[in-house]
C-alpha cells in the first residue's frame, strides 16, 4: 500500500513543471514525522580559468514529514553563473519530496523515491526552464559504512527549454559511521547528459571528494532543550575537463520537534 501511495503522489508531481540539483546525496530514510526542518545548502566552484570559476548555488528550505513515509520541502534556489561580474539571482521555487518505500533494515537495501517540481523565477536574458526530476534513492549498510546512491532523470519544461530529452545525473556517498558529531565520507556527483545521447566522459561533469558529516544536540550548544544541528562540509575535485577544478560544498540543517 505504501509503495502504491508513494508512486501515486510522485506521478502527480510529474505532471507539473524540478529544481536544480544540489550537492547533497538524498537518503531514502529522510522522513522525520513530527519535526520541522530549516535547511541551507550551498556550493561554490573554483577553476584556474576565470570564465569557469565563481559559480555559486544556494538554497533555503523548510520541510517536514507529512506522513511516516513522505517528507516534503519548499525551497528557494539562488544561483550565480561562472565568470566575472555575474549577478546572484533567485532562480527557482521548488517543491521537493522523498518517499520512503521500506523501513530501515526491512530488506536487503533501503529504498526510496525522490521527486522534485521546480518553477523558474527568472526572465529575460537569464530565463531558465522549468524542470521535473524523479528517481530512486537506495542505501545499504555494510559494516560501519552506509552506502547511498541516487539515480535521477530531469526533464525541462516550458518555453525556455535548452533540451527536450531526459538528463541523467547520479550521486554516491560512502560514509563511515564514526560518531554522531563527526563521520567521514566520500562523495561522487556526475551528470551524464541526455539519455541516449551522452557525450564522451571528458565532456561530462564528474566530481569526487571527501565530506565531513555530523550532528549536535541543540541543548549541548546552549540553544534549547530539543532538536539538532546537522552539518556537512566537503571539497569536490573535478575529474574531467568539463568540471571545475574544485567545488566547496556545505549544508546546515536545524531540526526542531513539534
Model-predicted regions and their roles:
Residues 2-9:
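Sec-dependent signal peptide recognition
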Residues 11-14:
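Repetitive helical segments and hydrophobic/amphipathic motifs
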Residues 20-258:
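Transmembrane beta-barrel domains of Gram-negative outer membranes and organellar outer membranes
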Residues 16-18:
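N-terminal signal peptide c-region/cleavage motif recognized by signal peptidases
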Amino acid at each position: 500500500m505504501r509503495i502504491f501511495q508513494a508512486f501515486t503522489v510522485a506521478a502527480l508531481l510529474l505532471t507539473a513543471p524540478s529544481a536544480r540539483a544540489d550537492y547533497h546525496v538524498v537518503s531514502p530514510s529522510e522522513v522525520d514525522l513530527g519535526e520541522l526542518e530549516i535547511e541551507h545548502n550551498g556550493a561554490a566552484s573554483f577553476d584556474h580559468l576565470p570564465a569557469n570559476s565563481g559559480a555559486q548555488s544556494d538554497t533555503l528550505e523548510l520541510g517536514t514529514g507529512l506522513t511516516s513515509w513522505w517528507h516534503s520541502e519548499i525551497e528557494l534556489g539562488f544561483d550565480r553563473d561562472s565568470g566575472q561580474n555575474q549577478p546572484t539571482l533567485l532562480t527557482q521555487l521548488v517543491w521537493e519530496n522523498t518517499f520512503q518505500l521500506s523501513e530501515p533494515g526491512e530488506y536487503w537495501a533501503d529504498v526510496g523515491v525522490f521527486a522534485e517540481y521546480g518553477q523558474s523565477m527568472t526572465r529575460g536574458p537569464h530565463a531558465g526552464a522549468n524542470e521535473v526530476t524523479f528517481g530512486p534513492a537506495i542505501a545499504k549498510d555494510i559494516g560501519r559504512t552506509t552506502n547511498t546512491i541516487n539515480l535521477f532523470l530531469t526533464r525541462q519544461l516550458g518555453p525556455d527549454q535548452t533540451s527536450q530529452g531526459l538528463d541523467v545525473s547520479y550521486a554516491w556517498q560512502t560514509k563511515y559511521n564514526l560518531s554522531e558529531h563527526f563521520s567521514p565520507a566520500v562523495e561522487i556527483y556526475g551528470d551524464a547528459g541526455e539519455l541516449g545521447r551522452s557525450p564522451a566522459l571528458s565532456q561530462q561533469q564528474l566530481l569526487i571528494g571527501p565530506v565531513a558529516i555530523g550532528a549536535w544536540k541543540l541543548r549541548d550548544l546552549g540553544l534549547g532543550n530539543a532538536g539538532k544541528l546537522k552539518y556537512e562540509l566537503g571539497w569536490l575535485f573535478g575529474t574531467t575537463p568539463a568540471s571545475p577544478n574544485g567545488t566547496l560544498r556545505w549544508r546546515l540543517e536545524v531540526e526542531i520537534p513539534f
